[in-house]
């Protein structure tokens, strides 16, 4: 099952979804007063998909469509993104709170555990979820982010990784962050139809 699931996730890069927005159900979970939006489709074992930067739930549309005949696919909008609440203050984005948001979504669906899938920044949240809450982690799939120890090691000792990760440090500078507009970030999306959803 794990190999099949991973293969489907990796291979579902073509646009299968069509108008997935008419097929998914939208809902909110309450994470200690912060509303976390999620979209869900299908039935079966629960998969929770956590997007990276600068995406939102819609980035998982193809995977949701491909897996929905065998799984309940749930893609969240992390706090600060799209339809989820955007609390002010950096302290409201601590990874422990982001993990708590995933817990809130799982609990709002009446479940005790899930297959956790994360990409990029969502991969960091997925790793922390699995490390902190193994009893709630049925399986873990992380795309584009190594184990936290490996990442820490590479950031400390590998000049190539330091260079490749510099963009994240740049985002912390006020003058750079102020230039990150929805229109500019949407240019990263290659599919013109999908690009419109990011603005």
Regions found by a protein language model. Give the residues of each.
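Residue-level signal for well-ordered alpha-helical scaffold segments within enzymatic catalytic domains
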Residues: 4, 39, 62-69, 104-108, ...
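Generic low-polarity alpha-helical segments
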Residues: 1, 12, 38, 52, ...
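Conserved HGGG/HGGXW glycine-rich cap/lid loop of the alpha/beta-hydrolase fold
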Residues: 34, 40-85
């Amino acid at each position: 099952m794990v190999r099949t699931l991973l293969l489907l996730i990796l291979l579902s890069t073509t646009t299968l979804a069509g108008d997935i927005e008419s097929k998914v159900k939208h809902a909110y979970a309450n994470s200690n007063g912060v509303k976390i939006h999620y979209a869900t489709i299908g039935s079966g074992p629960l998969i929770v998909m956590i997007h990276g930067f600068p995406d939102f739930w819609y980035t998982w549309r193809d995977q949701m469509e491909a897996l929905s005949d065998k799984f309940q696919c749930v893609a969240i909008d992390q706090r600060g993104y799209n339809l989820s609440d955007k609390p002010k203050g950096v302290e409201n984005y601590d990874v422990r709170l982001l993990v708590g948001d995933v817990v809130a979504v799982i609990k709002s669906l009446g479940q005790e555990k899930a297959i956790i899938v994360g990409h990029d920044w969502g991969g960091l949240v997925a790793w922390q979820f699995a490390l902190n809450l193994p009893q709630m982690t049925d399986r873990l799939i992380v795309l584009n982010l190594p184990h936290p120890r490996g990442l820490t090691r590479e950031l400390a000792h590998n000049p190539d990784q330091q260079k490749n990760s510099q963009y994240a440090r740049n985002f912390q500078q006020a003058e750079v962050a102020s230039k990150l507009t929805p229109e500019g970030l949407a240019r990263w999306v290659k599919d013109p139809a999908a690009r419109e959803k990011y603005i």
